[in-house]
């Protein structure tokens, strides 16, 4: 009855404005509280006596790095500020406090032995031009060019045709195709390519539907999981296999086919579980996706350049082991070709998600600091693996790897853990035999690293998917935790059960 008053809508708008201001104020207060907690805990860790940490040989630089690591972790989890802002802040903190170009008063009165190993400031700054960053840029450029030429429309039609128009099967199609590419290509290159194909499909979905989130999440999940299927799918696999087959060590002689014989079925099962989880968490509003994808592939000379360059890039990614050209180097080919031919313009460069690149660079910088200072090695060596019961050793190492890999490079995590666990495992071979042997221990680390995908900075595919704007961090956390728990349990069960006894 109030709508008879002419000023009703003004009153309603005013009330909405008050609610919005109140909500904004509450969010600001929440951010301030989170920021205060992160800073306070970090300062406490910075100021504590070194002996408190219980890590033998811990230096002043390493203590500072622990403080920065905890600060970064809390800021990324709390989202008190945008993730890329935290990354930039972390880089600056590393440069000013633990690098060889840090503030002068932070090194005064401290002996070289107590201070410890500093990080080369160039190593930190090089993270902004890391090869993976170049791969990101190549992926972004490739996506922009594919959209301008209509190639994304053409490929989306061809790839989705076998899966029909039912929403659930379209989602399954993206999962399986992404995983298949990821078994042989770089996870990052695969995600960059598949997200390009996904763009026209997202346009066919309602703006307020959860199905969009599920589709966007499917790409990083499938890219991360798919890489486990082959020894070359992801670096942690290769690292684990190196130590399993080391003639002077375990010497188990596990081949490419033998790895796939037990890891491929596991990977397929996990992919179908991921499909089920995504359907449950992010249900589609409509049963079918009417893929009336508008637009046709263009036939002008610049578009033909895009088609040829795209094909060459994908082929070189697939056969990088044959050609010897690294996938990161391959990513620069489309950048050069498209810039020279005018396919990509100065305005197009503004569409690149530079904030994502900065966010990833911050994670890389933290990983570099952990390794160069020796903190990562000291932390791993401080864990008494040899004294642990076999079950605790296997499960504990997997969980430690999973936790670490969510914040630093999966490859770096595996490179740190696998050598130590290989030594510890070789001295416990009899005790571990009933649980699948040392194979379960080391392959569990590879599995744990691949399943680490809770945050946008956990993996490059996560960061790329987050850049679409379709996924919030809470969505990644939810899916990442569920996939981590189920994947680890199923992974250990699979490897332990098979015992790698296939001929």
Kindly give the residue locations of the regions a language model identified:
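Long, contiguous bundles of hydrophobic transmembrane helices that form the permeation core
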Residues: 2-25, 270-318, 329, 334
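Flexible hinge motifs at transmembrane-helix junctions and intramembrane kinks/re-entrant loops
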Residues: 56-59, 71-89, 95-99, 124, ...
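Alpha-helical transmembrane segments
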Residues: 130-138, 259-272, 442-449
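Re-entrant/interfacial helical elements at transmembrane boundaries that shape
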Residues: 189-202, 216, 231-246, 335, ...
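Membrane-core helix-loop-helix motifs of multi-pass transport proteins
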Residues: 23-26, 200-284, 461-494
